[in-house]
Amino acid sequence: YLQYTHMFREVDGALYVGQSTYGDLCMHASFATGLIGQSYPPEYSILPGTRLGYPFLVDALSATMLIYGTPLAAAFSVPGTLMTGLIWLGFVLFTWEMTGKKSAVVIAFVLLFFNGGLGFLGTLDRVTSDPTALNDALNGYYQTPTNMPDVNLRWVNALCDLLVPQRTLMAGWLCVLPALYLLVAAMRERRAAAFLAVGLWAGPMPMIHTHSFLALGVISLGAMIDCLLREKKRRLRTLLLFALYGAAACALALPQLLEWTFPQTVGGGSLRILFNWVNNDGNGGLKDEYFWFWIKNVGLVYLIFPLAALTIRKPAVKALSLGCLLLYALAETVVFQPNVYDNNKLFFVAFLAMLPAAAEILTDIYARLKGIRGRCVLAAAFILASTLSGAITIVREAKSEYQIFGKEQVEAAAFIRENTLEDGL
């Protein structure tokens, strides 16, 4: 539904988008339309002579559809809808591979796509003194309890603020979920072909979504370290298997990184040290107390992650837990792009990779409480506290509607496209 309403929906000749796509979609549209007829490697259409360093392959898909006559809205909404559905399916399969429990699959799915921290408490508190506060949350521009920078709520809802507007991230998750699935299977089977398959899948990822590629690499490094520490008798074989995976991935990825990523990140001065993400006040201090910042943003499940990592004995959970911890630490200390906020693209991969284990722990806790009166109430309270902020955000996003281009602007653009040369000035 959001892929339809938020992607240049035409109403009486004007084009409409949603709250979350009001900014991002125009950028992606400029990439998709600018790629048509370009030489290779492509350049920014608004900055001739400047190489397009942004991962552009998902927008190249829309560009191909435009070339074959697909309307602008459909060129974005159709692949977006298909990719979102595949991400849902991929996460379900990944969670099943990790847990083997239907209840854990349902819980993990709900916690990911209805995710939200404790921001709803602030909204409800404001309602007691100002009855219009709830109306603001449901109708105001970025007043939802998952994304309010003025009170340091920055974790956002994965569905509304990541998958719908951020098309490269959507494509990145489409690739990283199968990669994690293949990695877990490879660690279990210990066959060279399985590790080679992970590497061949991961290699093309940099120009699909560089952050997802980096996240997968760091998680894989942590998983390798865990395997080497636990399996002393077959360390050499383990090291060789992971080396095969890494060699295959690097052989495919390195040309992309050298051509696009490194010049923009290192040469552009984006790489720098910064502790605690957006909670850093820029003056050597923190806006909120460290753990409170994460608890109020991520929610109660943040407290479940270390419990899952420490108590579940499954080798795959142990391996991915160490990898996610390394990724979390890296994203907490190093910024890879001009906008500090975009490190959430790394945090969220660790988040989704740990959710299956967290969901399994929650099902185990519920089972251990059998016979205790009120366990259903406790479970419902946990789920409600973990999803209410996200639910409010989804309702608000579904209601949002903004005109991005008026009828006259659309007609002017069509006239220019039909009556000027492609290389005209």
What role is predicted for each listed range?
Residues Y1-C175, T210, L214, K399-Q403:
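Active-site lumenal/periplasmic loops and adjacent helix-entry segments of GT-C-fold
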Residues T81-T84, L169, L214-G217, N339-A367:
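Hydrophobic/aromatic-rich transmembrane helices and adjacent perimembrane loops
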Residues C160-L162, A194-H209:
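Membrane-interface alpha helices of multi-pass inner-membrane proteins
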Residues L177-A186, I219-I225, N297-K318, D364:
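Hydrophobic, aromatic-rich transmembrane alpha-helices
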Residues A186-A194, L229-A243, F305-L325, R368-C376:
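Membrane-interface helix-loop-helix junctions at transmembrane boundaries of multi-pass membrane enzymes
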Residues A193-A202, I219, F242-A247, R313-V335, ...:
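Transmembrane alpha-helix segments characteristic
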Residues T238-A251, T363-I394:
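Signature aromatic-anchored transmembrane alpha helix within multi-pass, membrane-resident enzymes
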Residues G374-L425:
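Extracytoplasmic
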